[in-house]
A protein has these predicted regions:
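Alpha/beta hydrolase fold serine-hydrolase catalytic domain that processes acyl esters and thioesters
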Residues: 1-118, 122-164, 185-370
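Gly/Ala-rich beta-loop-alpha elbow adjacent to hydrolase catalytic centers
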Residues: 168-173, 177
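Short glycine-enriched nucleophile-adjacent loop
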Residues: 177-186
Length: 370
């Protein structure tokens, strides 16, 4: 199967003047945002640094293999260094914020693609518990702090940089990209050529009905793999494009697993049954709870995980035995009101899962009868 690495081999020598920026370029930059830029870049610096220089600096780090998030990240750095299409692009305004008190995890960077054309790229969820907590907060509050920061970042970039804009991001970064484009203002929206959302969650009906969202909707391109979970959360007014991934279920969230055909992904007609099941289950589950109930459930789970004293999911996995013991102890020590809230939410989830499974089975039977 051909992936973005094959694309870099085939098309990595073509300048944007010969082959304009498109969806595969966007996913490469969205993936690039996850690199540990804090090791080699000054935050908020407006001094341009080329992609090649940043990649070389990262590859020179003695611990780069463990500093990156995905196995393919160092391969991407090496490929970008050798790519005439990308290596001359300039990076500015690296932003990175992690705040436990406001439960905010936000990072973005601006890429000068060519003269008069810039890409604002947002990072998705990192490995921190705070980052995941902000994700879950989206289920009961909007905007979360990261979404507000995303709007502010895009507005500042647009004021500073003349010309065309492209906005992109993966996972929560895709959600931030769409939210920022929807609420940045009409003048900036007119300069936006495309918004690329790679398997990022959607929004509640209030956001989807906002004039700013409706105005930018036709420029949004949302891509989800066939077993998408994250990208199917909440609502999407824009049409989403289903792409083929060689991985299974949650592993399909990894864009390195997406199949690329020349300058497009390999498109599919529909998501698979597992994605439909999760979609039906979670939407029904959330619909049965008030925002306050969702918040109480999420806060309770987060507090239990926080008692492990781990700051990242990786730390929890490394010390899984101690983490499990701490989680069990914290769960036992829940006050009665919280325990009842968690039990109630878990019961609703189980009921929604049963209904979701039945709905998928009935749909399959109906398809066979056609």
């Amino acid at each position: 199967m051909t992936t973005l690495f094959d694309y870099l081999l085939w098309r990595g020598d073509l300048p944007l003047s010969a082959d304009p920026f498109h969806e595969v370029d966007g996913v490469i930059l969205a993936r690039f945002t996850y690199m540990p830029f804090h090791r080699v870049l000054r935050r908020d610096s407006l001094t341009p640094t080329t992609v090649e220089a940043v990649c070389r600096a990262l590859l020179a780090l003695p611990d780069i293999e463990t500093a990156v998030r995905r196995r393919g990240d160092t391969d991407l750095l090496r490929a970008l260094v050798e790519s005439p299409r990308y290596k001359g692009m300039e990076l500015t305004a690296y932003a990175d914020r992690l705040d436990a008190e406001s439960q905010t995890q936000f990072s973005a960077i601006t890429v000068k693609l060519e003269e008069g054309h810039y890409c604002v790229a947002y990072r998705g969820t990192d490995n921190t518990l705070i980052g995941w907590k902000e994700d879950f907060n989206m289920g009961f509050v909007c905007p979360v702090p990261g979404q507000k920061l995303a709007v502010d970042y895009l507005q500042r970039a647009a004021r500073r940089l003349p010309g065309r804009l492209t906005v992109c991001g993966h996972s929560k970064g895709g959600n931030f990209a769409v939210y920022a484009a929807a609420f940045c203002g009409d003048e900036i929206q007119d300069r936006i050529e495309a918004v690329y959302n790679y398997d990022g969650p959607g929004f509640d009906s209030k956001v989807l009905s906002e004039p700013g969202y409706q105005r930018i909707c036709q420029k949004i391109q949302t891509f989800v793999p066939q077993s998408s979970v994250v990208g199917m959360l909440l609502g999407h007014e824009e049409k989403y494009i289903i792409v083929h991934s060689e991985q299974t279920f949650l592993q399909q969230h990894d864009t390195y697993s997406w199949e690329v055909r020349q300058k497009h992904f390999h498109y599919l007609d529909t998501v698979d049954n597992s994605s439909r099941f999760v979609d039906y289950t979670l939407k029904a589950w959330l619909a049965q709870m008030t925002p306050a109930q969702r918040e109480q459930f999420v806060d309770a789970i987060y507090e239990v995980m926080r008692q492990t004293n781990a700051h990242t999911l990786h730390q929890m996995n490394e010390n899984w035995l101690a983490s499990a013991a701490s989680i069990l102890k914290s769960a036992k020590n829940m006050d009665e009101e919280t325990r009842q809230a968690v039990t109630h939410a878990a019961g609703l989830l189980l009921s929604s899962a049963k209904d979701g499974l039945l709905r998928v089975v009935l749909e399959q039977e109906a398809e066979k009868g056609e």
